[in-house]
UniProtKB/Swiss-Prot annotation:
The lineage of its organism: Eukaryota, Metazoa, Ecdysozoa, Arthropoda, Hexapoda. Expressed in early embryogenesis in 14 symmetrical pairs of segmentally arranged neuroblasts. Also, later in embryogenesis, in a cluster of cells in head region. Gene3D superfamilies: Winged helix-like DNA-binding domain superfamily/Winged helix DNA-binding domain (1.10.10.10). One of its GO terms (cellular component) is nucleus. InterPro entries: Fork_head_dom (IPR001766), FOX_domain-containing (IPR050211), TF_fork_head_CS_1 (IPR018122), TF_fork_head_CS_2 (IPR030456), WH-like_DNA-bd_sf (IPR036388), WH_DNA-bd_sf (IPR036390). Residues 225-245, 261-281 are annotated as: Disordered. SMART domains: FH (SM00339). Residues 12-103 bind DNA. This is Fork head domain-containing protein FD4. One of its GO terms (molecular function) is RNA polymerase II cis-regulatory region sequence-specific DNA binding. The keyword Metal-binding does not apply.
């Protein structure tokens, strides 16, 4: 007996699983991907049975989307209205239906663990890049941001303040708010551009303002002898010690690090010595990454501040890409490396070179063995 046609289902439940219904909705889209709301709309428009008890079947459909590897969640482009990600069908899942029939499905589609982890990492990175450029476009152009050099990224760390602010009160007196404290290391031109961050007009504390109720004991070396040795009194007179009600703060530092200098000249020497002694560079703040930034993951080939970068600092690669996605099927092999140039003018990214694996390592990965 032939199966009934689609139009004759009426109020009866159609013989399609939730996976088949979702795949049918995705395939009906010109871009082969749809947000969740459009998937709901397609099903209710096509099959009257699903116009009632919507909460029940929509919960089941969301469960199938989340726990089936045949569906992938593609981040929404920032230039598209609406909210929520898009759902697409994995290219390797096209043959899970026998002879292209949505009524019969082969065994459950399952991705290899390594492929699934790689895909999730790439899609997460893509979502972060989309969010970053969306923030840049709304908050200001990347051309107005100060360039960042990873060689000087260590200089962007906040150096310790001359005096601890852990127990400072919220105000200097009744009705007088406590001003913001800006370290001396952040005021130079070699560090973050304060004019772009809107911090040029912040007041700074003077030495007399922060001297108030706090005092700082001399720092001690981190040795057993220094820890068990009693502290030497700062005041030779016992009367002065009794009258002194200032809060003492013990600060223990590792040997080899001198006390933070308070004079400008000594501060510059301290900064130079500190930079040379640091062995690792921190990740730069997100708001400072722009076309002039040399971050290993983000290689910009063109942009507003790229002229200041040496040509040798950016690796050569024949593949260039931007952040827009036009079709999920074109990005599955390497999602970030196969995006099309649609928007984000003056920002072109160069995909990093593919990591080489020896045949032995690749065989271990294919056999789902853990390698260290």
């Amino acid at each position: 007996m032939p199966r009934p046609s689609r139009e004759s289902y009426g109020e009866q439940k159609p013989p399609y699983s939730y996976i088949s219904l979702t795949a049918m909705a995705i395939w009906s889209s010109p871009e082969k991907m749809l947000p969740l709301s459009d998937i709901y709309k397609f099903i209710t428009d096509r099959f009257p049975y699903y116009r009632k008890n919507t909460q029940r079947w929509q919960n089941s459909l969301r469960h199938n989307l989340s726990f089936n590897d045949c569906f992938i969640k593609v981040p929404r482009r920032p230039d598209r209205p609406g909210k929520g990600a898009y759902w697409a069908l994995h290219p390797q899942a096209f043959d899970m239906f026998e002879n292209g029939s949505l009524l019969r499905r082969r065994k459950r589609f399952k991705l290899h663990k390594n492929d699934k982890d790689l895909l999730n990492e790439e899609l997460t990175a893509l979502a972060n890049l989309n969010r970053f450029f969306f923030t840049t476009r709304n908050g200001g152009s990347a051309a107005h941001m100060s360039p960042l050099d990873m060689n000087n990224a260590a200089a962007m760390r906040l150096d310790p303040l001359p005096r601890s602010t852990a127990h400072m009160p919220n105000s200097l007196g009744p009705g007088v708010p406590l001003p913001h404290v800006m370290p001396a290391s952040m005021s130079g031109a070699d560090h973050t551009n304060l004019a772009d961050m809107g911090l040029t007009n912040l007041p700074a504390l003077t030495s007399s303002e922060i001297e108030g109720p706090l005092s700082l004991r001399p720092k001690r070396s981190f040795t057993i002898e220094s820890l068990i040795t009693p502290d030497k009194p700062e005041h030779p007179s016992e009367d002065e010690d009794d009258e002194d009600d200032r809060v003492d703060i013990d600060v223990v530092e590792c040997s080899g690090i001198s006390r933070y200098p308070t004079t400008p000249a000594a501060s510059e020497e301290y900064m130079s010595a500190s930079r040379s002694s640091r062995t690792e560079d921190p990740l730069p703040p997100m708001h400072t990454i722009n076309a002039g930034a040399h971050v290993p993951f983000l290689h910009y080939a063109t942009g507003a501040n790229v002229a200041g970068l040496p040509a040798s600092g950016i690796p050569n690669s024949p593949t260039t890409y931007e952040l827009a996605i036009s079709h999920p099927l074109f990005m599955m092999a390497a999602p970030i490396a196969n995006m099309h140039n649609i928007y984000y003018n003056n920002v072109t990214l160069v995909a990093p070179a593919q990591q080489y694996r020896s045949p032995e390592v690749q065989n271990r990965i294919d056999n789902d063995m853990r390698t260290i």
